[in-house]
């Protein structure tokens, strides 16, 4: 999970984790990925592997949101630069995740519907307007 989340900081969509084998990542480059993109991905994986030894908190706290980086109080053992912009590519191509982490297991067991009540989706066909 940590590696998948850190990949977001490197500008990648996080790969599927724990499917089909628990404790693994399913990485599926497609025919639409060019060689430069695949090389960039491999470089990111190599750098993330080094981060595991140097400062595993970079992975444990990933992904780093704009709100997290912009906060006045920075209490981490690594720099904001290292957190949000781990490579020069990301400086010009940053994708900011809107949330940090979600407790997937809790969410799977405790589904909460945030939809409007079904009545709010009804049409008033007499006045032809959406309520």
Each predicted region: which residue ranges?
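Non-catalytic terminal extensions of PLP-dependent enzymes
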Residues: 1-131
